[in-house]
């Protein structure tokens, strides 16, 4: 006996104590309802998205750890603008517009999977993704918004989210 890993996809905050999850958990001698409850807590902030969950179980102690892989940046951006797919021609055909604050919120959600050390760097990454799929930000090309972020024009907005970034 050692470490067992179970990989599943669940809708954020909506895992159910049913197959394929329940039998795999039961087989390891864990309380299915408790594990599902913990998975739902861990995935709650991704409500409406399908996320990959890795359940790492120590078969000896029955202790477990839950790792959640957040949705892709593209998925988060598309859902935010209500689009089903990226623009085929993002420079000329826009699929939607988002407020800068929404870009910041997505950056915070993506923190675990981004290599960004600061909120400002994470926001610039998300702005690049928005541009590549045809989304404008506050009615502007995300490239322009990125320049404005670098110039400090959004520092006050970013400061409001700094604490949330640190906790993420």
Curated annotation (Swiss-Prot):
InterPro entries: Ribosomal_uL11 (IPR000911), Ribosomal_uL11_C (IPR020783), Ribosomal_uL11_C_sf (IPR036769), Ribosomal_uL11_CS (IPR020785), Ribosomal_uL11_N (IPR020784), Ribosomal_uL11_N_sf (IPR036796). Pfam families: Ribosomal_L11 (PF00298), Ribosomal_L11_N (PF03946). Keywords: Ribonucleoprotein, Ribosomal protein, RNA-binding, rRNA-binding. GO terms for cellular component: large ribosomal subunit. Disulfide bonds: none annotated. One of its GO terms (molecular function) is large ribosomal subunit rRNA binding. Gene3D superfamilies: Ribosomal protein L11, C-terminal domain, Ribosomal protein L11/L12, N-terminal domain. GO terms for biological process: translation. Forms part of the ribosomal stalk which helps the ribosome interact with GTP-bound translation factors. NCBIfam families: PRK01143.1. Belongs to the universal ribosomal protein uL11 family. HAMAP family: Ribosomal_uL11 (MF_00736). Part of the ribosomal stalk of the 50S ribosomal subunit. Interacts with L10 and the large rRNA to form the base of the stalk. L10 forms an elongated spine to which L12 dimers bind in a sequential fashion forming a multimeric L10(L12)X complex. This is Large ribosomal subunit protein uL11.
